[in-house]
Design a protein with these regions (language model features):
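Short alpha-helical interaction motifs and adjacent low-complexity tails used for partner binding
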Residues: 1-380, 392, 396-405
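Cationic, low-complexity basic patches in intrinsically disordered or flexible, solvent-exposed regions
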Residues: 384
């Protein structure tokens, strides 16, 4: 399943596309009724996704039932959940019943063992955040085959989205019979934080090498403990400012904290690094590209330390810095940043991903998702004699990896 974001009645909701929009119309129409029924409240992502899953289950054809894996074969982990979490699921089920309204009677037609709370638990444990080429979340979805992959904090594969397609790509050599793994959590966190998140969300204790050896934890928590503890505690407030798009307040507070602790907590401390990212985002949103570039440059070395190549997060950070350098006319620096970003991206994204390969035919200013080769074209024009090395010639080959449509 894959989801796209659309709007109706000023509410954001997800529409599941099966093959063509015409085929999805019956479920689209049912969901419109549900959204109207719940106004002015907005259902959570998990309730919306569960509703789409229920519609899918109720309309299953025989060919659908022959799919490789079904939601019933995935773990719900209900027995492992705390009473508090079960109570939360119960509240969501109540919301679901109100949301479904007259459609609620159809729940009795669900396959055996798939009651609403069990389904909700399966959805929350097995769904993925859908991201764009620059790793910004744009939705949630169920990819049932992908959900069977286990976690490792140093995985041998990454997942890359391109529109409706999710591609699993190897990021290092994989030995015969070696298990394919992905990361369920952001690795920009200490071993304790990663383990806590994985235990709470997915109900297992991570025993990977990176967690058991506490690899890089000393760097992540470098500096005076009292200082970085203060930074850690204020970050949720700053993220709230970011979600509310209060950019001036976010930049002002982030800058004050970075200035206050600059001598006692280094940039490689993960809480300073998160501050740098927040300050960079605020500066870009306020069109203060000079300040944004300053923070972006400071973040490059810590990103290199924690996101070993070819990690897409480091490539995206290099891409952001390169764009800022390009905007400011620092073309040689931009060329270097784009070259590094491309060398990384061609592994996890592939050389035919839209972010690395597409060449728009019209001369337009660079947008947030302008493909890398487009930037190289513009740099070549601006510097008159700059030629692309052979590595940047677009290759019309299918990316290595397993694609799940």
């Amino acid at each position: 399943m894959y989801l796209f974001v659309k709007s109706l009645l000023f509410i954001v909701f997800f529409i599941l596309i099966f093959t063509f929009q015409k085929q999805a119309w019956p479920d689209h129409k049912r969901e419109c009724k549900c959204l109207k029924r719940l106004q002015p409240r907005i259902p959570t992502d998990s309730v919306r996704l569960l509703t789409r899953t229920i519609f899918k289950l109720l309309s299953q054809t025989e060919s659908d039932q022959e799919e490789l894996y079904s939601i019933a074969e995935h773990q719900s982990h209900l027995a492992d959940m705390s009473e508090e979490k079960k109570e939360g699921l119960g509240h969501l089920c109540t919301t679901l019943q109100v949301y479904l309204g007259e459609e609620n009677g159809d729940l009795s037609q669900l396959p055996p063992g798939l009651d609403p709370i069990s389904l909700l638990a399966r959805v929350t444990c097995n769904c993925f955040s859908i991201s764009d080429g620059e790793l910004q979340d744009v939705g949630v979805g169920l990819y049932l085959s992908m959900s069977l992959l286990n976690h490792d904090c140093q995985p041998n594969c990454v997942m890359i989205f391109e529109g409706k397609r999710l591609t699993l790509r190897a990021v290092r050599l994989i030995r015969p019979c070696e298990e394919l793994t992905i990361s369920y959590t952001d690795i920009l966190a200490t071993s304790k934080e990663r383990r806590s998140h994985l235990q709470k969300q997915y109900h297992f204790l991570c025993q990977c090498t990176r967690c058991t050896t506490e690899d890089k934890d000393c760097d992540m928590l470098a500096g005076e403990k009292m200082a970085w503890t203060s930074l850690r505690d204020v970050i949720p407030h700053l993220k709230q400012l970011q979600s509310e798009q209060r950019w001036e307040d976010l930049l002002k507070e982030s800058q004050a904290l970075l200035h206050r602790y600059t001598d006692v907590v280094p940039d490689r401390n993960i809480y300073v690094l998160r501050l740098l990212d927040l300050a960079m985002d605020a500066s870009i949103s306020l069109d203060d590209y000079k300040t944004a570039l300053e923070y972006g440059n400071r973040a490059l070395e810590p990103y290199k330390l924690y996101y070993s190549d070819p990690h897409p997060s480091r490539a995206v950070e290099l891409l952001r810095v390169g764009k800022l350098q390009h905007y400011m006319g620092r073309l040689e620096e931009a060329q270097g940043s784009f070259t590094q970003a491309y060398d990384i991206m061609k592994v996890p994204h592939g050389t035919d991903h839209v972010l690395t390969n597409e060449r728009p035919s019209t001369a337009v200013p660079p947008r947030p998702h302008t493909p890398l080769l487009r930037f190289f074209d513009m740099l070549a024009v601006n510097q008159h004699a700059m030629c692309l090395p052979p590595a940047f010639v677009p290759l019309c080959i299918k990316p290595a990896g397993l694609e799940f449509n």
